[in-house]
Amino acid sequence: RGLGDVYKRQGQVFDPFVYLGMLAAHTERIALGVASIVLPLRHPAHVAKAAASADVLSGGRLILGVASGDRPEEYPALKLPFNERGARFRASFEYIRRMWEEAPAFENLHGSPYGGMDMLPKPVSGKLPLLITGGSQQDPDWIARNGEGWITYPRGIEAQARIIRDWRARIEAAGGPEKPAVQSLYVDLHDDPDAAPRPIHLGFRLGLNPLRSYLESLQDIGINHVALNLRFNQADIGSTLQRLAEEILPEFAGG
């Protein structure tokens, strides 16, 4: 749901935070998200500052997806150990959370702010929702306790239903509140609205009507938000977005 929101996958040509600043200047209401910032490749102080800045400039519309990264070739370029990304992710996650406090003072793998200085601006609501992507090299219980939501990958409906049920059970066992589940979906939208689904990488080539049915199935199993990716879309992107806005968005947005 929430198909009116805009998510940018890290790995675009543009730096995600620069791109978010541009989107903030050209939009007014839609949520802006990134899926996801690879925390071990960036210093968490810079992430906390950039994310808070984008949030303030957008009027509190930023949703921050975070991940440990899955591309081994990126780590040597920054002289960072790929096999330590899980621990570095966890430390970065905790560092970012603490930096949004007033005059933070704490010990961390990435540095030790001593309380004599502060980071400005702060996010509009005091902190940003951090949505953990995939496993991020973490224990599932840690993800359930610490993330404000979870971004996962497309799967068959039955398998996805089991995974979402397990995640929500872990949240409940930890005494946590309800949290949103997000999944990505690559879509190549067919001109024929009734065109049957044909698998593509992490998604389908299909018509509007099967897409609507599929999204309804995801909603039924507890997926709250689907990030549609048009990378493989063969039709004009502008006209495809218009079709989605007119035929799909009214049935799912804001629910």
Where are these regions (language model features)?
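Active-site-adjacent structural elements that line small-molecule/cofactor binding pockets in enzymes
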Residues: 1-255
